[in-house]
């Protein structure tokens, strides 16, 4: 029988995490499942709250903030289920979503991973999938994101068409991503050089390198509230993003990496090594 481990990595997001856990508990998946929380040394009382309020949830407490990639890797290694569903702590899981994701991936042996449609608190869909990250695709994705945020009619129409159709993008967001555990291990898990950002794009690239593909499944919807811990530490978040961006280009686009460094240095945004 298919089973799934639901993994949530958290850092100082106690309120969002408890809302996420409550959303799962309100309509538990019928698929045999286990929920695992990886706490990255939070100082907001998260470990105690999980132990006290969610005794059925397994808590993995790190002694330091190891980041999203390394936190997920630890949980994936320790899981014993066929599937692993990675969730951000700032998501709300709707009834039937976990079962639908397990069914979608389980029914398609050519797919290595799948992601649902992500929507914000206002119900607007997010751009939670895309082409392989590179200089031109990044420019296109960022321009599209800005136009969509401004509710530019052409951008809104294009995004709304894309989020309604199942397709095979190069990546889906790590905010909610389901993968077969065996495939995750075969791909080498997440590259833990990425503390925050780009790890999902890199992971999907590793999964695709075996000849498999990634699924976007719009029939399943998950709410993504977008991280409080990141909003509280915008400078740290920006540095983490830039470090991951540089690491990604050094790995996947080494000819472009020096140009990226020059660009970031001119902007005063080049992170320390």
Predicted features and spans:
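Conserved donor NDP-sugar-binding/catalytic core segment of glycosyltransferases
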Residues: 92-128
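A short, conserved alpha-helix in the catalytic core of glycosyltransferases
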Residues: 162-164, 170-189, 193-221
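A conserved acidic beta->alpha catalytic loop
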Residues: 23, 39-48, 64, 94
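Glycine-rich, basic loop-to-helix element that forms the pyrophosphate-binding segment
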Residues: 61-79, 100
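Short, acidic, metal-binding catalytic loop of nucleotide-sugar glycosyltransferases
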Residues: 22-32
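Active-site-adjacent helix/loop segment of glycosyltransferases
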Residues: 198, 202-273
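Short, flexible, basic/aromatic active-site loop/helix in glycosyltransferases
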Residues: 133-169
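Short aromatic/hydrophobic "clamp" motif used to bind/position activated sugar donors
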Residues: 84
């Amino acid at each position: 029988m298919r089973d799934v481990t639901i993994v949530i990595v958290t850092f100082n997001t106690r309120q969002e995490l408890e809302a996420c856990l409550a959303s799962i508990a309100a309509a538990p998946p019928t698929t045999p499942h286990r929920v695992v929380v990886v706490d990255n040394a939070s100082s907001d009382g998260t470990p105690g709250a999980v132990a006290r309020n969610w005794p059925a949830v397994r808590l993995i407490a790190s002694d330091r903030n190891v980041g999203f990639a390394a936190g997920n890797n630890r949980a994936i290694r320790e899981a014993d289920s066929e599937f692993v569903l990675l969730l951000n702590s700032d998501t709300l899981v709707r009834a039937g979503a976990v079962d639908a994701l397990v069914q979608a991936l389980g029914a398609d042996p050519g797919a290595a991973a799948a992601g649902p449609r992500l929507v914000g608190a206002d119900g607007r869909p997010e751009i939670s999938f895309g082409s392989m990250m590179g200089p031109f695709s990044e420019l296109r994705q960022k321009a599209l994101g800005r136009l969509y945020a401004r509710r530019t009619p052409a951008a809104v129409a294009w995004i709304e068409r894309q989020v309604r159709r199942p397709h095979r993008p190069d990546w889906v967001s790590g905010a909610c991503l389901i993968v077969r555990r065996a495939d995750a291990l075969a791909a080498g898990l997440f590259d833990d050089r990425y503390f925050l950002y780009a790890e999902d794009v890199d992971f999907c690239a590793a999964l695709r390198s075996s000849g498999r593909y990634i699924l976007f499944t719009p029939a399943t919807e998950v709410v993504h509230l977008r991280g409080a811990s990141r909003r509280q530490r915008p400078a740290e978040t920006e540095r983490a993003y830039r470090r991951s961006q540089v690491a990604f280009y050094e790995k996947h686009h080494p000819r472009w990496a020096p140009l990226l460094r020059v660009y970031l240095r001119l902007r005063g945004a080049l992170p320390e090594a």
